[in-house]
Amino acid sequence: MLRKAVIMLGASLTLACGAFAVGVVPSGADSGSHCSFQHVPNLSPGVSYNSTSGTFTDPGGGTVDCKGAVSGSGDYTDSGTYSNATCQSGGTAEGDPTFTINGQTFTDHVKIVFGKEPPHFPKGLVRATFEGAKVKGTIDLMPTKGDCISSPVTQIKGMGEFDMK
C-alpha cells in the first residue's frame, strides 16, 4: 500500500514537472530530433493523499541532450501548474519549458497526464506522458523531498525523453 502511494505521488509530481522539462521544443525546428532530459523541480504546496493543485518551478540545473535536426546539449528552466494531484491517483499538469541548445532557445506549452503508462524503474515511481504543439514524450518521476505519508512530496527528479514534431 505504501509503495502504491509513493508511486502515485511520484506520478503526480512527475506530471507537474514533466510538463516543464519535456514541453520545450525549438520553434521552427525541423522534425526528427530526439531528446533526453532531466531536472529537479519544486512543488508548492506539494502532493499528498488529499487532492491538491499548485505550481511547480525548476530552480535551474536541468539538462537536455538532442540528436537529429536539433543536435547538442544544453540546459532548461520551466514552470507550470498541476491539478487534482494525489499520491494515489495522479493528476494533470501544464507547463512552459524553455531549453537552450547551442545558443538557440526553444519553448513550448505542454499538457501532462500522469499514470497512462506503467513506471520504468529505477528511473521513477510514476510515468507521465506529455504533448505540446512542438514536442511529445514521457517523463519518469521519483520523489526527492517528502514521502506522501509523513510529509507531502515537494520535490521530484524527472528523467524523460521527447521527440520534436
Language-model segments: which ranges?
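Compositionally biased, intrinsically disordered low-complexity segments
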Residues: 9-10, 25-27, 104, 109, ...
